Amino acid sequence: MRQVTIPLIQSKSMFCVIYRSSKRDQTYLYVEKKDDFSRVPEALMKGFGQPQLAMMLPLDGRKKLVNAELEKVKQALSEQGYYLQLPPPPEDLLKQHLSSVGQNTSHADR
């Protein structure tokens, strides 16, 4: 009897390598391979500064990321080879305060 070998189809695991910007606080660059910035535009790299390795992360089997949408990261990595995570916009505490004061006064007028 002849033995038949069935080749295993291995799906390519999706990993990303995350770098912290040396020039911009809370700004991170996700790429597919360690130290491979070949698909990142030169202007972006110039503004990003010297990339500082933050972590390597498997994306498969993960449901979410801390400060980025997982599906957007995966899509950007496969389509353009990188994903840029910018810091969240600063809170406008004055606007929040005025909004809450306005709400409180409208309730007091009733």
From Swiss-Prot:
PROSITE patterns: YCGL. Disulfide bonds: none annotated. Residues 97-110 have a biased composition (Polar residues). This is Protein YcgL. Residues 14-98 form the YcgL domain. InterPro entries: YcgL-like_sf, YcgL_dom. It comes from Salmonella schwarzengrund (strain CVM19633). SUPFAM superfamilies: YcgL-like (SSF160191). Residues 88-110 are annotated as: Disordered.
